[in-house]
Design a protein with these regions (language model features):
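Short, surface-exposed loop and linker segments with low hydrophobicity and enrichment for Pro/Ser/Thr
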Residues: 1-2, 29
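A short beta-strand micro-motif
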Residues: 3-8
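GIY-YIG-like beta-to-alpha core
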Residues: 11
Length: 203
């Protein structure tokens, strides 16, 4: 079998190594043995359906990694990079994801119930569909637009689709309609517009 090693992305030192059928098998064995994988470099790997629950890998770099169907429940993945990561059908339940960066990450049927998301950063529309209502903590979360605007997201965003030709997203302090941003002080005016369109659809 080929030789695989798990290295830190900071100084490239080897954390764990051995002969395995795949890097995923190497990672799963390291997690099974309770090896600390702090700062592990897992960038641009295919970890589809990986079973790494209870993993100890704060500050991990998972940028560009395919984590579709992976089980990362009850893990410490705080301060990690999830840039452009695929997280479809991924289980992050009960995990510590505090201060992790999810810019560019794609979500779909992603489980985050009981997860600590305090201070996390998001940027994709699919992130707004996450079930934040059942997360343990999402205080100080931020949503960053493609234009570089930062929106506070300490509460679950409200997403309205199908009413206009662009989604309407209500964040803590602002309302985003497509590329336009409005203050929540405009809510009465927006409510009137939405009421008009709703009535138009019904009739």
């Amino acid at each position: 079998m080929p030789h695989f090693s798990l290295k830190k992305h900071t100084d490239h030192s080897i954390i764990f190594e051995g002969n395995y059928a795949s890097l995923k098998d190497c990672l799963e064995h390291a997690v099974e043995r309770n090896i600390s994988l702090s700062h592990v470099n897992l960038k641009n790997h295919n970890l589809t359906n990986a079973n790494i629950d209870n993993a100890d890998m704060p500050y991990a770099d998972l940028s560009g990694t395919n984590l579709t169907g992976a089980n990362l429940s009850e893990a410490d993945i705080s301060n990690a990079l999830f840039h452009n990561c695929g997280l479809y059908n991924t289980c992050l339940s009960e995990s510590n994801l505090k201060n992790s960066d999810f810019r560019g990450a794609s979500f779909g049927a992603t489980l985050i119930n009981g997860a600590n998301l305090r201070g996390c950063v998001f940027s994709t529309l699919s992130a707004c569909d996450l079930d934040f209502q059942h997360a343990a903590d999402m205080f100080f979360c931020q949503y960053i637009t493609t234009e570089g605007d930062h929106y506070n997201m300490s509460n679950p965003p409200i997403v309205i689709k199908g009413l206009l030709n662009v989604p309407i997203i209500i964040f803590d302090d602002i309302i985003k309609i497509g590329s336009k941003t409005l203050s929540k002080t405009n809510m009465p005016q927006i409510s009137h517009i939405l009421s008009f369109y709703t009535h138009k659809i019904i009739t």
